Amino acid sequence: MNENIAEKFRADGVARPNWSAVFAVAFCVACLITVEFLPVSLLTPMAQDLGISEGIAGQSVTVTAFVAMFSSLFITQIIQATDRRYIVILFAVLLTASCLMVSFANSFTLLLLGRACLGLALGGFWAMSASLTMRLVPARTVPKALSVIFGAVSIALVIAAPLGSFLGGIIGWRNVFNAAAVMGVLCVIWVVKSLPSLPGEPSHQKQNMFSLLQRPGVMAGMIAIFMSFAGQFAFFTYIRPVYMNLAGFDVDGLTLVLLSFGIASFVGTSFSSYVLKRSVKLALAGAPLLLALSALTLIVWGSDKTVAAVIAIIWGLAFALVPVGWSTWITRSLADQAEKAGSIQVAVIQLANTCGAAVGGYALDNFGLLSPLALSGCLMLLTALVVAAKVRITPMS
């Protein structure tokens, strides 16, 4: 019965892709991600200006992720049948307001309030991203549209920290957030002009969010999502100490490694649609398997700089398939409840990021330099096995 509902949902979809709207969504996502990570490169001047420690100032990033987790879980319950066009506009307005609140903050409390506004927009937008995409393009074009959106994410992740640091040294951290507010205004304008009316879920289709986990293969999928992102953050959060102490990179060398990783991630995202068109399941199982082998390679031969640098590139290419692949899985296998599935997915990812970084840090402190790599490799291998054995992928109609 669920398959029939999904087929009907696809049949009622759009006939021609609305690429202007897709790029508007991608631009909004890029702006949200950029603003999320701006404080990482501006912590010192922010802390000095507000009279707080850098550790306290760093909580401006934590509060955004924390609010985003709850926003993603409850946003679909709150907005119900509201036209999604207005909701996306609201998120763009919240992005702009967040930047202005941070820019004019004269206290830590106002700073956190501004960053909480960003978390509301970030979590809500991510929860709706898959369902928005599948309503803007035909089913056959969804992987390509998702690769555009996640390509924007890759670009934002690459440029956010260095751009913030560069501009902060020239115009000051407050004006960096003022410039980000201008980007928010551009988001509002672009969304207003390009995004069509997207009515909310009819009342007869409403279903408890967590009842989706009872569908065959869905719980396994969410477990696989958790393990893959936890595995990523268990290692990548500590890539600096691992690469500097294991492979002997200096700061400049590490910068080049991270830049190579970012470029590889962008390339992987850009070409992900071609892989996913052939087999979503192969991509979702193959990518973590390749990452598990990469972790093993680093453990055995990571002291060689060339090997370590190549593995960073392979890691960026392979992991790029993971977020696009799981969003594609939602649009294929949970098409009739894509918003609610997206809400659970984003919450799972946020929790996985937190747990992966925390456990990876504990392992690094207590079991040595290679332990985050070993933890990451084990989680990636388990992900591949769960996907191969338990996750179901609905064929594209």
Curated annotation (Swiss-Prot):
Superkingdom to which the source organism belongs: Bacteria
Gene Ontology MF terms: antiporter activity; purine nucleoside transmembrane transporter activity
Catalytic activity: inosine(in) + H(+)(out) = inosine(out) + H(+)(in); guanosine(in) + H(+)(out) = guanosine(out) + H(+)(in)
Periplasmic topological segments: 43-54, 107, 169-175, 237-255, 303-305, 365-366
SUPFAM superfamilies: MFS general substrate transporter
Coiled coil: none
Cytoplasmic topological domain: 1-21, 76-85, 129-147, 197-215, 277-281, 327-343, 388-397
Pfam families for the chain: MFS_1 (PF07690)
Subcellular location, principal: membrane
Localization (cell): Cell inner membrane
Membrane topology listed for this record: Multi-pass membrane protein
Family, as annotated: Belongs to the major facilitator superfamily. DHA1 family. NepI (TC 2.A.1.2.26) subfamily.
General function of this protein: Involved in the efflux of purine ribonucleosides, such as inosine and guanosine.
Identification of the protein by name: Purine ribonucleoside efflux pump NepI
Organism, as annotated: Salmonella enteritidis PT4 (strain P125109)
Gene giving rise to this polypeptide: nepI
